[in-house]
């Protein structure tokens, strides 16, 4: 969300696609996403096009949002029986790009897809549609296990569905340099992913946790 807003404020055309049933990205960008709002759920099921559901972020010029709703919680079950279930989002984005061109609108510079913290069909749809994966990882031991599983899934997607997909960026979050564990996690990630790990880390800070409530 912060990356998307920052890029939009430089004058770039940016869109955030929220496919997390919790809808935190939609909330953070002040986008309505109650159950009666047209959303990415309708797009994935083929009932609407992206241009029918996309909204302008009220607080950031040049930033568009395809919101999530709680309906996404059951979307994975509904998607199982659909044709090309792993490619629903990819095809919708391609159609939206073509529509923008026909409508005389400029091509978007960036599309961010906010995924749920799981590796189901929603996340697979994101991987098939994307070119790059940005992984935020908490500086905690169990996060390393999650990273390992995520990378296996990325490799599977590369092999079978999207060969252009690559892990381009890993960002350490909730990093506390005063703890040995955080330092060890950072060193472990840096050893295995020296090119992908950013030098910048987001520190553990209670004010960051409190910020969404304001």
What do the PLM-derived regions correspond to, one by one?
Residues 1-214:
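P-loop NTP-binding core
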């Amino acid at each position: 969300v912060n990356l998307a807003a920052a890029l939009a404020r430089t004058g770039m055309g940016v869109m955030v696609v929220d496919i997390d049933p919790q809808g935190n990205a939609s909330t953070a960008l002040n986008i309505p996403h109650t159950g009666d709002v047209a959303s990415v759920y309708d797009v994935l099921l083929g009932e609407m096009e992206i241009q029918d559901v996309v909204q302008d972020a009220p607080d950031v010029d040049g930033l568009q949002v395809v919101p999530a709703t709680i309906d996404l919680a059951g979307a994975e079950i509904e998607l199982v029986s659909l044709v090309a279930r792993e490619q629903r989002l990819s095809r919708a984005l391609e159609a939206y790009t073509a529509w923008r061109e026909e409508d005389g609108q400029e091509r978007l510079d960036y599309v961010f897809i906010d995924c749920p913290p799981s590796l189901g069909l929603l996340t697979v749809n994101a991987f098939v549609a994307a070119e790059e994966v940005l992984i935020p990882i908490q500086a905690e031991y169990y996060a390393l296990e999650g990273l390992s599983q995520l990378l296996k899934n990325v490799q599977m997607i590369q092999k079978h569905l999207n060969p252009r997909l690559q892990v381009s960026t890993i960002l350490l979050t909730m990093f506390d340099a005063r703890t040995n564990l955080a330092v060890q996690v950072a060193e472990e990630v840096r050893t295995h992913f020296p090119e992908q790990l950013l030098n910048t880390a987001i520190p553990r800070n209670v004010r960051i946790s409190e910020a969404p409530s304001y």
